[in-house]
Amino acid sequence: MRTPDNDLPPPPDRYTCDGDAAVEARVARDQALIAAAVTRILTPPRFRALVLMGGYGRAEGGFVMHEGQPAPFNDYDYFIVVRGMGRAERAALEQTLARVSLELKGKVGVDVDFALLRDESLATADYSLINAEMLWGHRVVAGDPRVLAAMPAMPFAGLPQAELTRLMLNRGSLLLMNQRRLEAGEAISGQRLEIFFKFLFKAARACGDARLAGNRRYHPAYLTKAERLAGSDVAWPGQAEFLGLYDQAMEAKFHPRLARYEAAGADPRAWQGRMVQLWLDTLAWFEGVRLGRPIPDWEGYAAPTLGKGQGRDTLALPGNLARNLKTFGPLGLLRHARWALRHPRDRLISALPLLLANPGAAASPALADALGIAAGSPWVAASERFLDLWRRYS
């Protein structure tokens, strides 16, 4: 398995970490197919580039074997860089791309996700985790290979720590989806079990990211992450159990064989409980580092006076107010006025630990306040409200 240099970007000629020529050729064929589909509906000068992100863009994509033939395992994630397109034109293009992505999924076997990036905004792009990782490792599969050169430098050592809080929110939300299946009494087997474990391991990898970022040791390459986590002398909570889970999560990313957990009689509820506790412990530690003080408890953490770092500057306050007004309405704003100037993501970050720590419990006043619902609302309703908001503001 290749060991990436800690400073240099990933090799530009690979999509996977250790796939053979047949694996690489399969992913390359998929890229050509997807590029052809995009360039049929979008042409220069409006089209600037199709940029492959994520694991395949960083030469760390996963693969599986089906009847002796390689196939991708992870989603294909792209930014499409466009120029000179107004809001209405971009909205229309997004609708077309949604249809195209479904067609492509049927051909390549994994989700194909597109997001638009305006060429005019590159020079002032946000200093975010997704942008920093994209700059470090990406593949331009169609268009100008230097399209991202206009973006400012985004060193990982200076990455705003609230970006990792956001990552923990997004991966913790997958744990909430798992918990809803358990609370509903669903039979978790077959493909459902594979998805269940896929979500568990995504959360485990996010915990690794947060633990590294809390010590300014974050790196996008998974092999480097694993080395830094294993070699750390930091007394992280639950470190021994975490490293065991992280090793399995790493294997599941590169060489997924999730069906083996069903064959071994794995108990989904027990696995979920372990992962939720590690997620809660990691979030409490990381947020204590970010805020410079310990987290007293999850009820106290949910207070709107404790900022979660989303919508980070004063200029964002009018936008935060507008988002809350649009989402919760004038009456909701009055009832939960302390949240009015916080980004809605702050509400979600505040609510999620309470939902995961107390599955099945009625909404406490703090949880209800964050989600804009009535105290005492059933857990199922509160979790559904959370996921509705998360899909809008993740």
Each PLM stretch: what is its role?
Residues 35-76, 81-87:
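Active-site nucleotide-donor binding segment shared across nucleotidyl transfer reactions
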